[in-house]
Curated annotation (Swiss-Prot):
It comes from Kluyveromyces lactis (strain ATCC 8585 / CBS 2359 / DSM 70799 / NBRC 1267 / NRRL Y-1140 / WM37) (Yeast). This is Pre-rRNA-processing protein IPI3. Component of the RIX1 complex required for processing of ITS2 sequences from 35S pre-rRNA. The gene is IPI3. PANTHER family: WD REPEAT-CONTAINING PROTEIN 18, WD-REPEAT PROTEIN 18. SMART domains: WD40. It comes from the Eukaryota. InterPro entries: WD40/YVTN_repeat-like_dom_sf, WD40_repeat_dom_sf, WD40_rpt, WDR18/Ipi3/RID3. It is found in: Nucleus. GO terms for cellular component: nuclear pre-replicative complex; rixosome complex. Belongs to the WD repeat IPI3/WDR18 family. Component of the RIX1 complex, composed of IPI1, RIX1/IPI2 and IPI3 in a 1:2:2 stoichiometry. The complex interacts (via RIX1) with MDN1 (via its hexameric AAA ATPase ring) and the pre-60S ribosome particles. Keywords: Nucleus, Repeat, Ribosome biogenesis, rRNA processing, WD repeat. One of its GO terms (biological process) is rRNA processing.
Amino acid sequence: MDEQVIFTSNTAGTVATLHSLEQSSLRQCQTESKFSSCVVKQKYLFVAQSRKALIQVYDLHGSNKRESVEQRLPVPEVLQALECVDEDGLLLGATDSGKLYIWQLASGNLLNVKPMAHYQGIVKIKSICHGKYIVTAGSDSRLIFWQTMDLVQKDEPKPLFIIHDHSLPVTDFIFSNTLGHSLDGKLYTVSKDMSLRCYQVSVDHEPTCIATFTFPSSLNCVSLDTADRAIYVGTDTGVIQIPLYYKVSNSKIINLLQPNESKIYSITEITPGAMEPDLSSREKLFSIGQILCARIVHNNTTSVATSLDGSLLVSGDSTGKCTVTEIFSNQPLKEIRALSTNDSTGPVSNLIVFPVTQQSESLLDVTKIVKPWKFPNLQRAIVDRKHGINDVYVQFHENSVHNVLPVSDFDSYLDTVASEEHIFHQTGSINSTVNRVGQTKASMTATAKESKVSSDDDIYKSKDKQIAQLNGTVASLTDAYKELRKMHEDLMKEHQQLLSKNGTQTEN
C-alpha cells in the first residue's frame, strides 16, 4: 500500500506518491484559495478554479485515469472551499461572501443555499462523524457546527455550536483521530492571531477550551499525529512540533491537554544547533507556562499533513514545492516539485495525503473497458422540496470477481495449478523443462474432462461403500438395542419379585 500526495498551487497541480518516484501533472489546474479541492469516492479529484465559476474533475485511479480534465462542472459563482460527504453523496461549496451551497452529486440538484453562513468568506469546510455534522471556519474568526440534515431539509438552518474565541481569521482546524460516529473528541484551531486553541467537543454541551498555545508569529496550517501524540503547526518560519505529552523531568511527563482546567502555554522554540536545556531548566520554564518545542521544517509553510503511520511529515511551502521529512530524525527525505518550466508556481494552496490500494486484474479472463462515469451538471436553482422524489443517476459496474478462475471454474483452476507445478518441478539434478501454458491449453482441457469423468465414477463407488457400511452399523446398533432392552426387562422382573417378597415378610 502506497500513499498519494496531491498538491496544487496558483498555476499547477501535481499527483505524486510518498514511497516511490511516480509523479504526474494535472493539466489546466489553477487555484489560489486553500481547501478548494477534495477527493470524491477515493477516485475523483474536484478542484474549484480561481476566478472562474467552474469545478474541474480529474480521474485519479482505475483504467480511465489521466492527467487531463475529465469533466467540467459550472457553478453559480466562484467557490473558494470544497468538501464532499461521501456517506450522503453531498458536495458543499463556499464563497468569499460567506455563502454555503449544498448539492446532491447523484442528481446534481441544488438542495439548499445558506446566504449568510459567515459574515465574511468561508475558509474551510469539514465533514465529521461520517457525514452527520459539517464544520465551517471563516475569515470572521468564527467556527460553526452544523447538522447535515438541517442544511439539507430546512430553509433556515440554525447552527449547533459557534466558537468565536479567536480575534483574527481562522486559517485551519483539525479534529482528533478518536472522533468516531458520535461527536466526542478534541478540536484544534489555528488563527492569524498567533494562537492555537484546543477544545473538548461533545454533543451534550458547548465546546470547552482546555488549552491555548501562543506563538511569536501567525499560524497558517495545522496537522495532527495519527496517535494524537503531537501537533504540527505551520508558520511563516517553518513547522513547529508540539508534544502533547511533555517531559518535565526524568520521572515526570505531563499531559498538556487536561480536561479539568484551561491553561495558556507560550511556545519557546529550540534554536537549531544550540544545546538543549537540561531538565531542571525545562521544569522552571514549564512552571511559568513556557514550553520548549523543536522546529522540523525551516521554510514558509502553507500546508502540512502527516503520513498514515505518523513517521513522515509532508509540508508545502510558499515556493510551490512539498518536502517529505522524517519526524524522528528531522531529516528531509525528498522534495516534490510541480512539473513546470517556471521557477515558482506560487504557494501550495491544497495538500491531500491519503492511502492508495492498487487493484490487480491479472487473474481476469476478459478485461472489459468501462466507460468513465460522468457527474450530472450542478443545478443553479434550489430544488422544490414539495415533490419529494427526484431522479438519481448511478452507474453499476459488472462484478469482475465472477470472471476470476477460482470462482468461474474451480476444476479448471486446479488443473491449471497442477500443470504449472509440473512445469516448474525439477525431475533431475540438471535437466529441467519449461513449457508455455498457452500452448498446452487444449490438452489441459481434454485431460480435465477425462479426469472429471473418472473422478465422478470414483465418487459413486465410494458412496456405495459408505452406504453399505452405514447399513451394517445401523443393523448392529439395532441388535445391541434389542439385547439391552431384554436385559432391562429381566432386571425389572427380578426387582418386582424382590419387592413382593419383602412386603410379605413385613406383614408376617
